[in-house]
């Protein structure tokens, strides 16, 4: 069967090469890297909607996700959420010490659990961010309960902080934003979805539309910045880590609670400082 499409809308070789560079770097079967993905929340929404269907259940074994994902999932009512499409959501909060509640995670996984979403970074919370090793242990635990469950890792703020990524420890999908670590400060827009080929393809049908997927999408001249940013990303991430350690040292000495502290190992580039009052911020 011959499929004829407007040549001007087809993906150029520069796109495909960039995606292969990402896939090779992250050791995955496939990767979707596009400027049409506007931010990390958008990338996560594409991955979730692309791989979940009505009647499926989504499980977060790491507590509440980012505020922006609450409306995507339907934790807070919003138009077009996963909840509106019949996807149910379960959540298992972390234990008081910030570790995984394996007992209740085991109870939460059931025959309808289609996808488990794991947020690597603390985000706006004060819990510790998770190491790749911890994420691998959680994925292994979940897969023993339900081998066919899709394990997705929100890798925002975590790329290149460690020598390995969640895709190296069993993640089926790994999602991130190019306006954070992998963009190296040069990417003006974009996101990536890396992982199993079928999962990435499913996400691509949500990014564009069924039947087209990753075969279309103009780059509007930003690919050069995406390539250069990805090349510089490890160095830029290193600089961000140095800045975070420096900030932790300063605020610690001023008496403010900080997470992580100035000597703890770092799993992302986020530095939390508890100022205590609105006036403290000013």
Regions found by a protein language model. Name each.
Residues 10, 30-31, 38-243, 248-251, ...:
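Conserved PLP-enzyme active-site core in the AAT-like
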Residues 5, 14, 242:
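N-terminal glycine-rich, Lys/His-bearing helix-loop that initiates the first secondary-structure elements
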Residues 252-282:
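Conserved C-terminal alpha-helix-loop-beta "cap" of PLP-dependent enzymes
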Residues 14-31, 43:
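Long amphipathic N-terminal alpha/beta scaffold segment
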Residues 1, 18-20, 75-81:
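Intrinsically disordered, low-complexity boundary segments flanking structured domains
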Residues 3, 30-33, 270-272:
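Ordered hydrophobic segments in well-structured contexts
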Residues 1-7, 11:
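Single conserved hydrophobic/aromatic residue that forms the stacking wall/gate
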